[in-house]
Swiss-Prot record:
EC annotation from Swiss-Prot or TrEMBL: 3.5.1.88
Protein name, per record: Peptide deformylase
Gene that encodes the chain: def
Protein source organism: Helicobacter hepaticus (strain ATCC 51449 / 3B1)
Active site: 147
Annotated NCBIfam families: pept_deformyl (TIGR00079), PRK00150.1-3 (NF001159)
InterPro entries in UniProt: Peptide_deformylase, Peptide_deformylase_sf
Enzyme class (EC, first level): hydrolase
Binding site for Fe cation: 104, 146, 150
Reaction catalysis annotation: N-terminal N-formyl-L-methionyl-[peptide] + H2O = N-terminal L-methionyl-[peptide] + formate
Similarity section: Belongs to the polypeptide deformylase family.
Keyword RNA-binding: no
Keywords of this entry: Hydrolase, Iron, Metal-binding, Protein biosynthesis
GO molecular function, one term: metal ion binding
Amino acid sequence: MKYPEMTLATLAILKYPNALLRKKSIPVEIFDDNLHNFLDDMYETLIESKGVGLAAIQVGRAERILIINIPREEDKQQYKEDLLEIINPTFLTQEECVEWEEGCLSVPDFYESIKRFDKVSIAYKDRYGNDRILKAQGFLAVAIQHEIDHLNGVLFVDKLPILKRKKFEKELKKLKKESQA
């Protein structure tokens, strides 16, 4: 029997200040082909956007789903076999503070240092609903925290000190004026 070829879709990424980005995501309860197709579309979107992480809420779906694909050290390339699909994550441990420069697909062209934990461990489910535990450090730990923040309606710019936050708002207004000109 021949099956129709599956086509992947690139999803539209919501941009700040879209109000949906502030919505708290709900846990996933059904692990089926619809979820698998959505995860595949998220991956396609992540790669097309040249990002390292993407939360479902960033593409308009308020479920506790995120994906991360960190480029490899040796060649700075992303490989599908390194993809993490993380569903319904909860933190188990968080250790040692670090500052890391972050950016976000929903806040394009803005980067700033944010305080995060350098080491985390999380419990989560994979695409099939299997329980998993992940220990992460460095860039991966930071990316996990950034994406879980999205699931809770928090953006990295919310973590900026007040002066840096004002700088961000000023730059955003300037960009809006330029795009309307």
